[in-house]
């Protein structure tokens, strides 16, 4: 029964037939190949995610994830009319007076969802299926939000995707039904095998200025990731990190919006 997310393959078919009396029975093997891709379940991100440290209060998680970023094109002197959050503190240290960021509000929001399927190193020593499946479900839900808001988005991962060449691991940002169907199919085909370290993806995407928002989803933040994730921080990108477990999130830059899964009172995760 195909009751779990994944790729299911049906091979050769054995056909047996005959008359009602069972006197003349014939059989035949038919060459047959068919695969069924079971998609991940949706997850309610408002119910299942919480800002790490709860720094954002009761504000909508969905709003923080899809809020349109704007490109910073310069700075100007603070007049007292601008929001305090727009103050550019680095310039204050340089010029000795408060400066605020100037934004290009025509800048198009384009997102890239990054999925890390590695739970520990080496990855095969512990595969946390519950954490991985919850992460994959969150990815589906976020993709649906981007689609609904007509925000072009892409997807990239470091895991092997069943039925595809090993290096075919990225969907470039776009919109449309065909693009979204491909995205869902990738999620259904995702395996638990790691093709390469996630750090390679962070390095490749670091200077991709056509992407305004990075959404990183991982079962946990390993020590090896910390410097690479923090290096993504700049004035041109909005970084969102969603981790199933909250370990090492305290070592991630406060300029990165961090989320983790809500826990029940007994310490278990809502699923």
Locate the predicted segments by residue.
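Von Willebrand factor type A / integrin I
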Residues: 185-271
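Short, conserved, surface-exposed binding loops centered on an aromatic residue
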Residues: 103-105, 145-147, 174-178, 204-208
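Short, structured coil/loop segments at alpha-helix boundaries
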Residues: 41-43, 65, 176-177, 222-226, ...
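Short, charged loop segments at secondary-structure junctions
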Residues: 164-199
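An amphipathic, basic-hydrophobic helix/alpha-beta surface used to engage anionic
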Residues: 1-165, 217, 231
């Amino acid at each position: 029964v195909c009751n779990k997310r994944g790729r299911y393959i049906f091979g050769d078919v054995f056909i047996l037939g005959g008359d009602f009396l069972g006197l003349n029975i014939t059989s035949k093997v038919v060459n047959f190949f068919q695969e069924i891709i079971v998609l991940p379940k949706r997850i309610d991100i408002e119910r299942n995610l919480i800002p790490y440290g709860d720094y954002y209060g009761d504000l909508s998680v969905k709003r923080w994830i899809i809020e349109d970023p704007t490109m910073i094109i310069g700075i100007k002197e603070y007049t007292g009319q601008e929001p305090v959050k727009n103050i550019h503190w680095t310039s204050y240290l340089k010029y000795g007076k408060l400066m605020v960021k100037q934004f290009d509000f025509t800048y198009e929001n384009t997102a890239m969802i990054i999925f890390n399927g590695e739970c520990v190193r080496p990855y095969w020593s512990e595969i946390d299926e519950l954490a991985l499946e919850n992460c994959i479900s969150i990815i589906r839900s976020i993709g649906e939000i981007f689609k609904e808001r007509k925000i072009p988005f892409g997807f990239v991962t470091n895991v092997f995707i069943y039925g595809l060449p090993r290096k075919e691991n990225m969907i470039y940002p776009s919109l449309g039904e065909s693009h979204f169907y491909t995205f869902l199919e990738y999620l259904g085909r995702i395996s638990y095998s790691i093709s390469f370290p996630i750090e390679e993806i962070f390095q490749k995407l670091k200077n991709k200025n056509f992407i305004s928002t990075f959404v990183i989803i991982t079962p946990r933040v390993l020590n090896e990731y910390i410097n690479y994730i923090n290096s993504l921080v700049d004035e041109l990108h909005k970084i969102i990190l969603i981790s199933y477990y909250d370990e090492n999130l305290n070592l991630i830059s406060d300029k990165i919006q961090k989320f983790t899964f809500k826990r029940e009172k007994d310490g278990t995760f809502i699923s």
